[in-house]
């Protein structure tokens, strides 16, 4: 039986890391695509030459031709411009929208049956645009944001409580930006909700508020430290977690930017929500209950995403 085929659109820092992780996990054969001649080919060869030491069996190739992604089971899109210090994700809108058009058409023409995971920022608007340009079914196109934001939240919580990250669960919903909503009520340590841990004296509300804010600023913190790029290890790991859930039909409950039509009071839009990912793609949205305050924060985040979508329509009239 043929191995799954994984197409990685964009051979930058995230793309290269994705290729390495996919090979290490033996998720399938990898095609690394980029418009820069030599870059995907060089990275693919470098990773392939690590195979004998890492002991993985996976074909690794690089290309500048969309025809080579034909028949891909999974496409992960990282193509576009990354943030620099002082920039917000939203500042990338105009540049990366054009990239999504060419990528969407490339996937539509060559890998129309693929499960597509978008990482390009501003995430929620870009995954919406990518779906529009590609014409793929909504349940086969989603964005990687909530898994990453939740991982950052979990890391900060484990550090605060001095416990294993394996015992920390967390959910971050809403848009992938300053308005994201880390839900402390649905986040736990060994099943104990964070509000209970505050009552137990494990931490204070002030410290928890600071952790929530640091989670929102997680990407900007790394951009500020690197100065010449943005995060790539954690984003790549998060996208691989989603791809693995699809390829292995794991039915994982993961927060991601998915198409919502009816759940959570939303009608026909992409935004970060809890989902179940399996062989059917985004198989369902988990319609959680929110308090009045949580709903207000979520609504604010939804409004911010809608604003970016409207901006996309103003830039490219074919999206209207």
UniProtKB/Swiss-Prot annotation:
<keyword id="KW-0816">Tricarboxylic acid cycle</keyword>
<keyword id="KW-0520">NAD</keyword>
<feature type="binding site">
    <location>
        <position position="121"/>
    </location>
    <ligand>
        <name>substrate</name>
    </ligand>
</feature>
<dbReference type="InterPro" id="IPR015955">
    <property type="entry name" value="Lactate_DH/Glyco_Ohase_4_C"/>
</dbReference>
<feature type="binding site">
    <location>
        <begin position="10"/>
        <end position="15"/>
    </location>
    <ligand>
        <name>NAD(+)</name>
    </ligand>
</feature>
<dbReference type="InterPro" id="IPR001236">
    <property type="entry name" value="Lactate/malate_DH_N"/>
</dbReference>
<keyword id="KW-0560">Oxidoreductase</keyword>
<feature type="binding site">
    <location>
        <position position="152"/>
    </location>
    <ligand>
        <name>substrate</name>
    </ligand>
</feature>
<dbReference type="GO" id="GO:0030060">
    <property type="term" value="F:L-malate dehydrogenase (NAD+) activity"/>
</dbReference>
<dbReference type="GO" id="GO:0006099">
    <property type="term" value="P:tricarboxylic acid cycle"/>
</dbReference>
<feature type="binding site">
    <location>
        <position position="34"/>
    </location>
    <ligand>
        <name>NAD(+)</name>
    </ligand>
</feature>
<feature type="binding site">
    <location>
        <position position="96"/>
    </location>
    <ligand>
        <name>NAD(+)</name>
    </ligand>
</feature>
<dbReference type="InterPro" id="IPR011275">
    <property type="entry name" value="Malate_DH_type3"/>
</dbReference>
<protein>
    <recommendedName>
        <fullName>Malate dehydrogenase</fullName>
        <ecNumber>1.1.1.37</ecNumber>
    </recommendedName>
</protein>
<feature type="binding site">
    <location>
        <position position="89"/>
    </location>
    <ligand>
        <name>substrate</name>
    </ligand>
</feature>
<dbReference type="InterPro" id="IPR036291">
    <property type="entry name" value="NAD(P)-bd_dom_sf"/>
</dbReference>
<feature type="active site" description="Proton acceptor">
    <location>
        <position position="176"/>
    </location>
</feature>
<feature type="binding site">
    <location>
        <position position="83"/>
    </location>
    <ligand>
        <name>substrate</name>
    </ligand>
</feature>
<dbReference type="Pfam" id="PF00056">
    <property type="entry name" value="Ldh_1_N"/>
</dbReference>
<dbReference type="GO" id="GO:0004459">
    <property type="term" value="F:L-lactate dehydrogenase activity"/>
</dbReference>
<dbReference type="InterPro" id="IPR022383">
    <property type="entry name" value="Lactate/malate_DH_C"/>
</dbReference>
<comment type="function">
    <text>Catalyzes the reversible oxidation of malate to oxaloacetate.</text>
</comment>
<comment type="similarity">
    <text>Belongs to the LDH/MDH superfamily. MDH type 3 family.</text>
</comment>
<dbReference type="Pfam" id="PF02866">
    <property type="entry name" value="Ldh_1_C"/>
</dbReference>
<feature type="binding site">
    <location>
        <begin position="119"/>
        <end position="121"/>
    </location>
    <ligand>
        <name>NAD(+)</name>
    </ligand>
</feature>
<dbReference type="GO" id="GO:0006089">
    <property type="term" value="P:lactate metabolic process"/>
</dbReference>
<dbReference type="InterPro" id="IPR001557">
    <property type="entry name" value="L-lactate/malate_DH"/>
</dbReference>
């Amino acid at each position: 039986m043929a191995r799954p085929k994984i197409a990685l659109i964009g051979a930058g820092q995230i793309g290269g890391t994705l290729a390495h992780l996919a090979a290490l996990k033996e998720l399938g054969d990898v095609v690394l695509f980029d418009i820069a001649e030599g870059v995907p080919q060089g990275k693919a060869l470098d990773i392939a030459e690590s195979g004998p030491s890492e002991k993985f069996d996976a074909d690794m190739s690089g290309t500048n031709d969309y025809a080579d992604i034909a028949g891909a089971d999974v496409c992960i899109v990282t193509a576009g411009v990354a943030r620099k210090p002082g920039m917000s994700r939203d500042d990338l809108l105009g540049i990366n929208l054009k990239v999504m058009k060419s990528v969407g058409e490339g996937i539509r023409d060559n890998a129309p049956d693929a499960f597509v995971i978008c990482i390009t920022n501003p995430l929620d608007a870009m995954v919406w645009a990518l779906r529009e340009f590609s014409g793929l079914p909504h349940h086969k196109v989603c964005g990687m944001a909530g898994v990453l934001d939740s991982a950052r939240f979990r890391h900060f919580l484990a550090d605060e409580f001095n416990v294993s990250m394996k015992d920390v669960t967390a959910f971050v919903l809403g848009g992938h930006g300053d308005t994201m909503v880390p839900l402390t009520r649905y986040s736990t340590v060994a099943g104990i909700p964070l509000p209970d841990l505050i009552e137990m004296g494990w931490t204070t509300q002030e410290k928890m508020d600071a952790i929530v804010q640091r989670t929102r600023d997680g990407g900007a913190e790394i951009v500020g430290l690197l100065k010449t790029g943005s995060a790539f290890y954690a984003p790549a790991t998060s996208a691989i977690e989603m791809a693995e859930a699809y390829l292995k039909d794991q039915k994982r409950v993961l927060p991601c930017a998915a198409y919502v039509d009816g759940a959570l009071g939303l009608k026909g839009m992409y935004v970060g929500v809890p989902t179940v990912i399996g062989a059917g793609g985004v198989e369902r949205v988990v319609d959680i209950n929110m308090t009045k305050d949580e709903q207000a924060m979520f609504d604010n985040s939804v409004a911010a995403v809608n604003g970016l979508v409207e901006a996309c329509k103003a830039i490219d009239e074919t999206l209207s």
